[in-house]
UniProtKB/Swiss-Prot annotation:
Predominant place of localization: periplasm
Protein name: Thiol:disulfide interchange protein DsbC
Keyword Ligase belongs to the record: no
Gene: dsbC
Originating species: Pasteurella multocida (strain Pm70)
Signal peptide region: 1-19
Gene Ontology annotations for the cellular component aspect, listed alphabetically: periplasmic space
Record NCBIfam families: PRK10877.1
Length: 227
């Protein structure tokens, strides 16, 4: 990512003279960005480029590119506009998630997690408390060591197990699966996490697509979601 961004900044996009979205896509692909989808942003004069490498913002004259989050200001504070663009992709993976549903559901969160992560374990061991507060918890895999790591292969076995809920809880309690699998589902989850800007676990995505980095106690998370 840093190498790609450095290339973009050095070029400054000043040499680009494209006038439509397809030309934007082609130029960004030449610079090493993949899966590029260009659309209008909420900001006049700025285009949004959703890529496998993250989200970028490009001025319509194609002279500047911005890397980072875009927030909308409101009376309630800041709203993460960038992550909300990825909600459709998140929904596409709903059948690959390990889900712990709340009986009286009020909120749904999606957690990018790593079974070797201390605070992911803390969060999971409180799963009943989250559920009792009306919070449904959905997990996606985000092995911090990358998709070639042992943890990635363990998580692949968990997410494809006959009973993923049981397999995940067992792993959290120190009993990981004995048979490992090459990352497939895990790889897709990891890539989506990168698009959301996940750089650590647990990372929580709200129903609005906003990213909350780090662990929050059940009551604190409920307060955050109610805002």
């Amino acid at each position: 990512m840093k190498k790609i961004l450095s290339t973009l900044l050095m070029l400054g996009m000043s040499s680009l003279t494209f006038a439509n979205s397809q030309q934007v896509v082609e130029q960004l692909q030449k610079m090493g960005l993949s899966g590029v989808e260009v659309s209008d942003s909420p900001v006049k004069g700025i285009k949004t480029a959703v890529t496998d490498n993250g989200i970028f913002y490009i001025t319509e004259d194609a002279k500047y590119i911005l890397d980072g989050k875009l927030y909308a200001l409101s009376e309630k504070g800041l709203r993460d506009v960038s992550s909300s663009l990825l909600l459709d992709k998140l929904t596409a993976y709903k059948n690959e998630m390990v889900v712990y549903p709340a009986k009286d559901e009020k909120h749904v969160i999606t957690v990018f997690m790593d079974t070797s992560c201390h605070y992911c374990k803390v969060l999971h061991k409180q799963i009943k408390e989250y559920n009792d507060l009306g919070i449904t918890v959905r997990y996606l895999a985000f092995p911090r060591g990358g998709v070639q790591s042992k943890t990635a292969r363990e998580m692949e076995a968990i997410f494809t197990a006959q009973d993923p809920q049981f397999a995940l809880t067992e792993a959290i309690n120190g009993n990981p699966p004995k048979t490992l699998k090459d990352a497939n589902i895990t790889k897709k989850h990891y890539q989506l996490g990168l698009q959301f800007g996940v750089n650590g676990t647990p990372s929580i995505v709200t129903e609005k697509g906003e990213l909350i980095g780090g662990y929050l106690k059940p009551a604190d998370l409920l307060s955050e979601l109610a805002q």
